[in-house]
A protein has these predicted regions:
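Conserved catalytic core of the tyrosine transesterase superfamily
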Residues: 1-62, 66-374
Length: 374
């Protein structure tokens, strides 16, 4: 059976006729190869696998020792070092790193793969689990969104979009070629807001991703958008979801019509290379970083806080739908959250909305007291 099961000790290591030069390094490499095979068999994405393996290599270099020598204090020192440097990692990243080390140790200590028996015979020591509840960061939903991240107010959004639109008009009037990329960015940011998209989801949109909503014919072919690159879970790769166009954001339909059937998109010389919704000046599709940089430049130009990034448009979508009276379960489905608690973290309703809600509840209670049978 040796070597036939993904992740099992390879035959080359257990063959007594094959000597092990620099045994510790070769065995560690084989362990990573086995873990990689196991994760592939589980259907994880190659990017997730690559990142996890690179982290374990980094951890090994930090300790200067190998898995059968690792102890809980090693992971304590590693994570503490990452949290105390000039650029400390976030709690979310810290949790991801500790989980990766824990999963690797779980793989090594599983009797089905034979690493414990092999290491005891070869090195006189065995791998053990070094990550426990008492030395791993606890997961609480409240730390999923940084404290500085919030929604845009409607006034801030109006100010931002007005600035970008005015900039497009000025560049066009001056005969500058910059007006077209600026117009593309303007439409892209509004689409991002009007559908509550993540940056990658927005960037990866194609023309074919839009379709009609049979129950709302007024929106034509822009009644819904099929999001094909939604955030996956546990390294499973992109998920899909359908986001409906809602009345509060139906102004985006005219924006999309102007961009597509209105011929604006086709003015890019690269437009015919693919069906990407957002072609760039030199390539078939815009990059994630380019949209982020363009948004940051516009935000800084109007003097908005730096913590208001492109992703905050998604927070704003959630908040403004809740303020408009949409059911929380519908909003959760629209943005593709697995848990309602995550949607709750994205919501930062205004004080006016809170006051109106309280006043409505007071008025309802007074009405019930005056007419109990009503």
């Amino acid at each position: 059976v040796s070597g036939a099961v993904p992740g099992f000790v390879p035959r080359m290591l257990v063959d007594p006729d094959i000597g092990l030069f620099r045994a510790d390094e070769r065995v560690f490499t084989a362990m990573l190869d086995g873990w990689r095979a196991q994760m592939l068999a589980r259907g994880l994405t190659t990017q997730t696998i690559k990142q996890r393996c690179q982290l374990l290599e980094r951890f090994q270099r930090f300790t200067g020792e190998f898995p059968w020598q690792w102890r809980p204090a090693d992971v304590d020192d590693f994570l503490a070092d990452l949290r105390s440097g000039e650029k400390p990692i976030s709690l979310k990243t810290l949790r991801s790193y500790s989980n990766a080390v824990a999963m690797f140790c779980s793989y090594l200590t599983h009797p089905g793969y034979g690493w414990g028996e092999f290491c005891e015979r070869t090195f006189g020591d065995i791998p053990s689990q070094i990550c426990f509840e008492w030395n791993m960061p606890r997961h609480t939903t409240d730390d999923a969104v940084p404290a500085k991240k919030r929604s845009f107010t409607k006034a801030e959004l109006q100010r931002l979009f007005d600035y970008i639109d005015d900039l497009v008009d000025r560049e066009y009037a001056a005969g500058s070629k910059r007006w077209l990329p600026l117009f593309r960015d303007s439409v892209a940011f509004k689409v991002c807001y009007a559908y509550g998209l993540r940056r990658r989801e927005m960037t990866m949109l194609d023309l074919e991703d839009f379709g009609p909503n049979p129950h709302v014919s007024d929106y034509g072919r822009f009644g819904a958008v099929q999001v094909r690159f939604a955030k996956g879970t546990a390294g499973s790769g992109p998920r899909r979801r359908t986001v409906l166009t809602v009345p509060e954001f139906d102004w985006v339909v005219d924006q999309l019509k102007t961009w597509t059937v209105g011929g604006m998109r086709q003015q890019f010389p690269t437009a015919d290379r693919s069906s990407a919704l957002w072609p760039s000046e030199r390539g078939a599709r815009m990059s994630l970083g380019s949209f982020g940089d363009a948004f940051a430049a516009a935000r800084d130009a109007v003097g908005l806080p730096q913590e208001l990034g492109l992703h905050c448009l998604r927070h704003s979508y959630v908040t403004h739908l809740i303020e408009a009276g949409y059911d929380a379960a519908f909003v959760q489905t629209q943005v593709g959250h697995s848990y309602a608690s995550t949607t709750g973290l994205y919501t930062s309703v205004s004080s006016d909305f809170k006051q109106k809600t309280v006043q409505q509840m007071i008025a309802r209670r007074i009405a019930n007291l005056e007419d109990p049978d009503a």
